[in-house]
From Swiss-Prot:
This is Nucleoid-associated protein Athe_1143. Belongs to the YbaB/EbfC family. It comes from Caldicellulosiruptor bescii (strain ATCC BAA-1888 / DSM 6725 / KCTC 15123 / Z-1320) (Anaerocellum thermophilum). It holds the Pfam family YbaB_DNA_bd. Binds to DNA and alters its conformation. May be involved in regulation of gene expression, nucleoid organization and DNA protection. One of its GO terms (cellular component) is cytosol. One of its GO terms (molecular function) is DNA binding. Keywords: Cytoplasm, DNA-binding. It comes from the Bacteria. Homodimer. It is found in: Cytoplasm, Nucleoid.
């Protein structure tokens, strides 16, 4: 009778089954990655003064700025609004990816995408 080469995994451990499950999970992750890359998230800051649209690949698709917040005497405020909006958009994409990965894998994989 052959000994189990992986103690602690029980006698019913099947490396082929594990490889099959790993391939299936990899396929599901790749499919999810493509789907997430197509999704877009819109975020605003300053009460809607600045809006950013970002996709799942963290590519900025558009930035909209209300004309009334463009003040040549106060460029710093506009810069702060844009930075805050872009950073929030990135955080939302990261959260979306993590939540969707948990659905597929049963656990999060930070920084996967």
């Amino acid at each position: 009778m052959a000994k189990n080469k992986f103690p602690g995994l029980g006698g019913g451990f099947n490396i082929n089954q594990l490889q099959k499950q790993a391939r299936k999970m990899q396929e599901e992750i790749e499919k999810l990655q493509e789907e997430l890359n197509q999704r877009e998230i819109e975020v605003s800051s300053g009460g809607g003064a600045v809006k950013v649209v970002i996709n799942g690949k963290k590519e900025i698709k558009s930035i909209q700025i209300l004309p009334e917040v463009v003040d040549p005497e106060d460029v710093e405020t506009l810069q702060d609004l844009i930075v805050a909006c872009v950073n929030e958009a990135i955080r939302k994409v990261d959260k979306m990816v993590e939540e969707e990965m948990q659905k597929v894998t049963g656990f999060g994989i930070p920084g996967l995408f």
